[in-house]
Each structure stands twice: as structure tokens, then as C-alpha cells.
């Protein structure tokens, strides 16, 4: 049985471990491959290179899951939207402003997404059988906000002003992205992904009414559509920064796994783990410190979630400046805890 899926089968005696952005800039072997391709999106579509970097952290650390190397913005890019990645700046997109802009979006995605599915098939062939393969997409609100802002990591005034003032158009764009996201996830499962994940990086900027409309409702639609085709494929949802709205999300969205950020109290994680599998939530900055601090913070999480439906991960992605030896230490510590979790002196 695949380790990452163990909690889904009621087997919670072992703690599965993997990390968001586990294939990335903190790895010297990743940097070496990344330097061979100037354009980031071209790198994401390169079957050989994306396969190689997907497998790198598995070879180095033996995580319980590999997550396909891709990006949440490959979907709008494959649908014809202008997306570019500028070094030291991040994604730059054509800004969606009016009904006229729908003419730049294609009903059917172009060949680029086929490259993503090829990567999944290739990784699946090379991945050791006990290890799960995770496919993913950006959740509609996060992808939509990139399109409305024209760039990432803003204060989201533009996006929020747009959805307040243009309710019908905003809903039309949301529905379009929701439908295409579900299709993208279904195709990833068809290609061999064992688990699927939805990243809603910017869900935390919305008030409750908008959170319901732009996060809860589309996520629910996507999951129901995927489950019609793949009822047994586990789905992880990560409405990052949702705060108190995590509880509303759990109540209204039929997810298998809830990924949570580092701001969520351990008591809440324990409580929620009776309803769903909880994934998280070590602060990524802890991995920039030292072994004693890593051990202290990790132990608290493992003790709190002992015997619970739980997958160990970070509260967000591994930071580029993270020392590889700290990732190794953390992984080994979690493994050692598994072996000795009945020993009260551990």
C-alpha cells in the first residue's frame, strides 16, 4: 500500500512525509538542470528535465510522495493567456480587464498540457512503487487573481475590486477556470497521478462571502467532477491563510485531505483530523535554523498528531535558501519518531 495513502485507508500508525516545493532551488542538482533552460515555462514543459527534477528529492530523501514538477500557471498559459516568468520578479501576465479578453482564451487547451501528462507518465514509470505521485493545479481563485492582477504577490486590491464591481463577468471567468481546472486534474489522474492537490495560495485575502463564492463553491465543483471519473483518487485541498474559514471549508467541501498553513493551532489540527486527514504544518523558516530547533518544533507537531489522520508537511513550500542537510535531518527525525512512537522517553 502506498505510504501517502495510508491514512486514507485508516492506517495511521505511520506518518507519511513529503514537502511542497521539494523539487526546487534549494537542491544543487535542481539548479544544475534548471540552468540548462532559460525560460521557466519551457522548463516545465520539457518532459526529460521535468521528470528528472521531480525524481531528484525522492532519490535524495526517499519521501513518501513525489509531486510533479510543474506550475499552477501552466493552465492559463496552455489556454492561450500570456504568461511569462521574469527572473527575480516572478510571473507577469496579460491583465484580464473586460469581456473582450475572453477572446484570448481558448476553449480547448493547446498541446502544452499534453507535455505535463507525458511527464506524469514518465515519472510514474520510474517512480518506486510504494511512492505516491501527486498531480496538482492552482485553485480557480488563485489562478484568476494572477490574471486579474497581471502579476503575483500583490495586495490583491485589483482582484477584489474587480469581483465587487463586475459580479457577472467575475463569475463567468471563475466558471471557465473551474471547468478547465477539473479537466486538467482528471487528465493528470488518467496519466497516472495517484493523488491530486489544489493550491489556493491567495484564498486568505477574501472575506467570508467572497471566500464562499470564489473558494468553497468552485473547489466543491472541481472535486465532484473529478470524483465522478476517479472516485477513489484522494484529493488534497490547500486554502492557504483561510484562518477561521478553514472550518467552513471542511464542513462544505468533500475533501479527503486538508493541507493547513503554520498559523493553524495544533489543537485545531487534532480536532479537524476526526473529520478529514490533515496535512502540515511546520513553518518553512524553521528549516533555516538549526537541528535543535527543528527537532523541538517537529516533535511538538508529531506528539500532537500522534495516532491521528495526519500527513507531515510544511505550512508552505521549502524556501530556496534551505540547507539540504536540514531537510535530511527533519526527514530522518520523522522516520525515527515513527519507529519509536511508543517510547515515552523519545
Swiss-Prot record:
Predominant location: cytoplasm
Top-level EC class as recorded in UniProt: lyase
HAMAP family on file: URO_D
A matching Pfam family: URO-D
Similarity comment text for this entry: Belongs to the uroporphyrinogen decarboxylase family.
Protein keywords: Cytoplasm, Decarboxylase, Lyase, Porphyrin biosynthesis
SUPFAM superfamilies (alphabetical): UROD/MetE-like
Reaction(s) catalysed by this chain's protein: uroporphyrinogen III + 4 H(+) = coproporphyrinogen III + 4 CO2
Binding site for substrate: 21-25, 71, 146, 201, 316
Site label Transition state stabilizer, positions: 71
Gene: hemE
GO MF, any single term: uroporphyrinogen decarboxylase activity
Record carries keyword Lipid biosynthesis: no
Pathway: Porphyrin-containing compound metabolism; protoporphyrin-IX biosynthesis; coproporphyrinogen-III from 5-aminolevulinate: step 4/4
Keyword Lyase: yes
Name of the protein this chain belongs to: Uroporphyrinogen decarboxylase
A single GO cellular-component term on record: cytosol
Task performed by this protein: Catalyzes the decarboxylation of four acetate groups of uroporphyrinogen-III to yield coproporphyrinogen-III.
Subunit-structure text: Homodimer.
Subcellular location: Cytoplasm
NCBIfam families for this protein: hemE (TIGR01464)
Amino acid at each position: 500500500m502506498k505510504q501517502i495513502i495510508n491514512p486514507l485507508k485508516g492506517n495511521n500508525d505511520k506518518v507519511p512525509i513529503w514537502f511542497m516545493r521539494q523539487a526546487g532551488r534549494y537542491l544543487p542538482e535542481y539548479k544544475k538542470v534548471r540552468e540548462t533552460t532559460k525560460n521557466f515555462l519551457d522548463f516545465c514543459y520539457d518532459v526529460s528535465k521535468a521528470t528528472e527534477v521531480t525524481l531528484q528529492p525522492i532519490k535524495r530523501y526517499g519521501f513518501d510522495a513525489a509531486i510533479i514538477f510543474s506550475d499552477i500557471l501552466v493552465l492559463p498559459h496552455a489556454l492561450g493567456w500570456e504568461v511569462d516568468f521574469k527572473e527575480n520578479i516572478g510571473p507577469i501576465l496579460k491583465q484580464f480587464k473586460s469581456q473582450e479578453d475572453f477572446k484570448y482564451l481558448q476553449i480547448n487547451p493547446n498541446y502544452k498540457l499534453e507535455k505535463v501528462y507525458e511527464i506524469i507518465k514518465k515519472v510514474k514509470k520510474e517512480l518506486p512503487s510504494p511512492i505516491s505521485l501527486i498531480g496538482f493545479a492552482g485553485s480557480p481563485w488563485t489562478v484568476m487573481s494572477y490574471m486579474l492582477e497581471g502579476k503575483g504577490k500583490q495586495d490583491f486590491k485589483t482582484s477584489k475590486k474587480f469581483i465587487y464591481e463586475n459580479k457577472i463577468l467575475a463569475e463567468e471567468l471563475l466558471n471557465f477556470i473551474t471547468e478547465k481546472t477539473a479537466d486538467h486534474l482528471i487528465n493528470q489522474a488518467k496519466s497516472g497521478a495517484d493523488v491530486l492537490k489544489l493550491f489556493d495560495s491567495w484564498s486568505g485575502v477574501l472575506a467570508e462571502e467572497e471566500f464562499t463564492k470564489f473558494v468553497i463553491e468552485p473547489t466543491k465543483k472541481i472535486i465532484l467532477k473529478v470524483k465522478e471519473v476517479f472516485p477513489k483518487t484522494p484529493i488534497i485541498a490547500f486554502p492557504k491563510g483561510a484562518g477561521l474559514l478553514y472550518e467552513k471549508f471542511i464542513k462544505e467541501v468533500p475533501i479527503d485531505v486538508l493541507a493547513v498553513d503554520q498559523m493553524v493551532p495544533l489543537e485545531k489540527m487534532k480536532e479537524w483530523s476526526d473529520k478529514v486527514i490533515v496535512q502540515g504544518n511546520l513553518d518553512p523558516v524553521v528549516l533555516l535554523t538549526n537541528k535543535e530547533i527543528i527537532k523541538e518544533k517537529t516533535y511538538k507537531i508529531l506528539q500532537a498528531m500522534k495516532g491521528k489522520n495526519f500527513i507531515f508537511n510544511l505550512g508552505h513550500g521549502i524556501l530556496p535558501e534551505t540547507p539540504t542537510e536540514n531537510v535530511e535531518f527533519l526527514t530522518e527525525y520523522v522516520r525515527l519518531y515513527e519507529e519509536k512512537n511508543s517510547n515515552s522517553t523519545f
